[in-house]
Amino acid sequence: LFKLINMKIIYGSSKKKGVSAFIKMIKAIENGESIAITPDGPKGPKEIVKDGIIKLAQTTGAPIVPLFWKVKNHKLLNSWDNFIIPFPFSKGVYIFGEPIHVKRKVTAKKLFQIKNSIQNEFDKLTKEVENYNFNKKVK
């Protein structure tokens, strides 16, 4: 799906090619590209923010911009993260959060606080997108 809309894919996880993927993401950001990652990691647990997204923002200075989406018609996979495959031409909605900046030099305590604030923002936006009503008329 991403290749159809001309988006590059960087493969990697905390178990496989993690360092290589991290370096490729840094280079992409340095080249002015935007990247999207799933912050709960490849192993879960579902919807729990991992350190990778914070380390990437800290290393590059790029902000974390929360993005959540929902489609009306989809197939729900029986996977640990309940992965969704949208049906073609289904209605959808995207909800963006405010950019979150992470300074390059911060204490471990501050990083913990940042991670908690990111998790809280993600939880809030997850509920917002899950409660979106496709039948409600938009003015």
What are these regions (language model features)?
Residues 12, 38, 66-69:
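Generic beta-sheet signal
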Residues 1-24, 60, 76:
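Catalytic core of membrane glycerolipid acyltransferases/transacylases, capturing the structured
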Residues 26-56, 60:
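Catalytic-site beta-strand/loop segments enriched in glycine and acidic/polar residues
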Residues 30, 113-139:
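Membrane-interfacial terminal anchoring regions of lipid-handling membrane enzymes
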